[in-house]
Amino acid sequence: MLKVQNLYLCYPGQSEPIFQNLTFELKEGELLWLTGPNGCGKTSLLNCISGIIPQRIKAEFRGDIILNDLDLNPIPINERFRYLAYQMSDPDNQIFFPRVEKELSFALENAGLTIKEMKERIIRATEDFGLQDFWETEPGKLSLGQKKLLVLAFCSAQDTPLYLLDEPTSALSGESILKVKNWLENLLSNGKIVIMAEHNPDLGSLATQILDLGK
């Protein structure tokens, strides 16, 4: 279970908080759909849960974030990703390595997996998103949509209890959107918790809860 309690966020120089007294709970297999206009705080909320705020982006932040009885707040970002996977809206912020295979294996190197287990996860993730023919490709040569799928495959391979998704289908169309929807359905059926900012109502139809941050 994820418990988010009494979150408050205000950026330096702003007189009004982005949100305050924000509270919700999610059980295993639930998806929270974040809605509202641009700038209402959807990405900010994901950044708070991931630890980017306040560890990398400084802001006045308080509140409790509890995942399966574990307090996430004191956990450094590099350790927090053992418990959550985060797909940011701009894939270039998450792609660092010269080959797709290395990009996917990076998140698993400190997970205590055998080489065989790592390879199995990577193969499954690339097949889920149609990237199996791109193992040796330089990520910089991928299209924007392919980069987006690469980051989603990266998240899938992590196999964490919690997934944070920021516009997962932007720059995607047709078959690629269907792959993402199928993946989300599989996550939920396996008891994962998902928080998603997304404009596509077809994906929003998977939500068990909706939080409109624009209200």
Where are these regions (language model features)?
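Hydrophobic anchor residue at the start of the ABC signature
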Residues: L152-A153
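The feature captures the beta-strand-to-loop junction immediately N-terminal to the Walker
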Residues: T35-P37
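A short, flexible loop at the N-terminus of ABC-type nucleotide-binding domains that lies
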Residues: M1-V4, Y8-N21, I53-K58, P76
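Conserved ABC ATPase "signature" region
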Residues: K116-F134
